[in-house]
Swiss-Prot record:
Gene Ontology terms, MF aspect: acetylcholine receptor inhibitor activity; ion channel regulator activity; toxin activity
Keywords, ordered alphabetically: Acetylcholine receptor inhibiting toxin, Disulfide bond, Ion channel impairing toxin, Neurotoxin, Postsynaptic neurotoxin, Secreted, Toxin
The name this protein goes by in its record: Alpha-elapitoxin-Bf1b
GO annotations of cellular component type: extracellular region
Superkingdom classification of source: Eukaryota
Keyword Metal-binding: no
Subcellular location, principal: secreted
Bias type Polar residues, positions: 1-15
Compartments, as annotated in UniProt: Secreted
Function: Binds to muscle nicotinic acetylcholine receptor (nAChR) and inhibit acetylcholine from binding to the receptor, thereby impairing neuromuscular transmission.
Length: 25
């Protein structure tokens, strides 16, 4: 999965989608 963290300008690939303001797809 790709998680876009609003606190980071670079997307990170993770198996677990964190809760919060992150956008995962």
């Amino acid at each position: 999965r790709i998680c876009l963290n609003q606190q980071s300008s670079e997307p990170q690939t993770t198996e677990i989608c964190p809760d919060g303001e992150d956008t995962c797809y």
